Amino acid sequence: MDRIIEKLDHGWWVVSHEQKLWLPKGELPYGEAANFDLVGQRALQIGEWQGEPVWLVQQQRRHDMGSVRQVIDLDVGLFQLAGRGVQLAEFYRSHKYCGYCGHEMYPSKTEWAMLCSHCRERYYPQIAPCIIVAIRRDDSILLAQHTRHRNGVHTVLAGFVEVGETLEQAVAREVMEESGIKVKNLRYVTSQPWPFPQSLMTAFMAEYDSGEIVIDPKELLEANWYRYDDLPLLPPPGTVARRLIEDTVAMCRAEYE
């Protein structure tokens, strides 16, 4: 339940509007509310980090509004809370009116939801399930440069799960669509909430089965097999993509060194 911010309130401040985050000096604000001109605003506590509250404030600032990507180097737990705040702020902003009857809605006091007092419909934040998979062939890993990555970063394959599809089917389909190959021996590794804009990444490792690389030019600039000790520029630490790549490299080292 949200409340009015008081002078001595302190903690981490996720000030967000339209999927942007307020980052004075390029950092997530931490300290007393008075130091950031937040007294009198409404805030919702969305978690705790190292014993300190993390607050969401739905507000646009004139300056220093940026992407949550800018704080990706934070500790994973704090980054995830910042992402939670950005997603919740957008959820509340985009669900002011009921999609069924058009009446104004109000936030629940017991959970992250919006309620319609007219037709009693209940809305929750949208979460888009995605798969991400590291594919190994002997001492090499399949890495691709995506069209959205113009900085030379190479990463593993990923994509959204479609309606009526299992996670395993999504892996097989996405890999075939983007690279033209088949995989086998799929193994679940971990998951990571990813606020771009509201994804839940479900991470797998797989082995190459058959086929030659034929990329989808709408998705990829290039894709290739890279030996574990000769890799291109990789995603930053803390991302699930980097975790998958490092796990694959560790497996290759154990087998080939």
From Swiss-Prot:
Residues reported in the UniProt entry to bind a divalent metal cation 2: E174
Residues where Zn(2+) binds: C98, C101, C116, C119
Pfam family, one: NUDIX
Residues that, per the record, bind substrate: K25, R69, E111, Y124, Q192, P193, W194, P195, F196, P197, Q198, S199, A241
CDD domains from the UniProt entry: NUDIX_NADH_pyrophosphatase_Nudt13
InterPro entries registered for this protein in UniProt: NAD-cap_RNA_hydrolase_NudC (IPR050241), NudC-like_C (IPR049734), NUDIX_hydrolase-like_dom_sf (IPR015797), NUDIX_hydrolase_CS (IPR020084), NUDIX_hydrolase_dom (IPR000086), RNA_Hydrolase_NudC (IPR022925), Znr_NADH_PPase (IPR015376)
Chain's role: mRNA decapping enzyme that specifically removes the nicotinamide adenine dinucleotide (NAD) cap from a subset of mRNAs by hydrolyzing the diphosphate linkage to produce nicotinamide mononucleotide (NMN) and 5' monophosphate mRNA. The NAD-cap is present at the 5'-end of some mRNAs and stabilizes RNA against 5'-processing. Has preference for mRNAs with a 5'-end purine. Catalyzes the hydrolysis of a broad range of dinucleotide pyrophosphates.
UniProt name for this protein: NAD-capped RNA hydrolase NudC
Primary gene name: nudC
